[in-house]
């Protein structure tokens, strides 16, 4: 329902703001601290929480609910530029590519259930608000782009819904701590609000879905 969905989004944003405030203090005191660098490249391994209890999603692919693969593994790559600072906020612009996958093979004791594969890919620009200095900083960011979400049970490999571009809003936050002059440990918690798809071949449309992805890895400046 729209009201419930809006409350969920507000709750998530407030949680991210509290996280950013918690980690926004400088990593170590310096006078003066270095500014946030002009650019950063991120490379993260990620864990997407693919839904495994969404009957509408299963129906859109002509699947049983128990066939949905669920949690998977992925990769996030990002490039961000930081051209402008105003008081305590450094503004950033950039982009992110996120890819992830999951596989599920049911036990042999459940013959009606089919093996299934799940693939997700998102590409989007991002605007970020950054708090901290060049030794370490936290951020809130978001953007609008497109994604493709393929959920393929065995025997239904040629499904138009798996190749349908879906408008997707991503929003989240994270932090970077520089453990060496040019290398940082970084993490990111991101939500992908995926628009509903179209109905194909007599199957219902895929529902509006929010996918959460947690990533961690390195950043290079």
PLM regions: where:
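Predominantly the C-terminal beta-signal and adjacent terminal strand-loop region
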Residues: 31-36, 52-56, 63, 171, ...
């Amino acid at each position: 329902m729209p009201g419930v969905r809006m409350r969920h989004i507000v709750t998530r944003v407030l949680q991210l703001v509290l996280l950013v405030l918690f980690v926004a203090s400088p990593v170590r005191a310096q006078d003066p601290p270095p500014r946030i660098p002009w650019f950063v490249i991120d490379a993260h391994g990620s864990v997407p929480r693919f839904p495994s209890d969404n009957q509408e999603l299963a129906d859109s692919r002509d699947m049983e609910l128990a066939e949905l693969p669920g949690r998977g593994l992925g990769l996030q790559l990002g490039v961000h530029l930081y051209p402008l600072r105003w008081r305590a906020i450094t503004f950033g612009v950039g982009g992110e590519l996120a890819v992830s996958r999951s596989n599920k093979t049911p036990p042999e004791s459940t013959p009606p259930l089919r093996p299934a594969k799940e693939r997700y890919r998102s590409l989007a620009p991002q605007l970020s608000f950054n708090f901290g200095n060049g030794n370490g900083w936290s951020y809130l960011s978001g953007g609008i782009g497109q994604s493709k979400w393929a959920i393929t049970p065995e025997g239904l490999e040629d499904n138009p819904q798996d190749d349908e571009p879906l408008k997707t809003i991503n929003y989240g936050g994270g932090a970077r701590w520089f453990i060496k002059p040019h290398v940082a440990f970084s993490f990111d918690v991101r939500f992908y609000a995926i628009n509903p798809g179209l109905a194909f071949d007599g199957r219902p449309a895929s529902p509006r879905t929010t996918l959460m992805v947690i990533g961690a890895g390195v950043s290079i400046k």
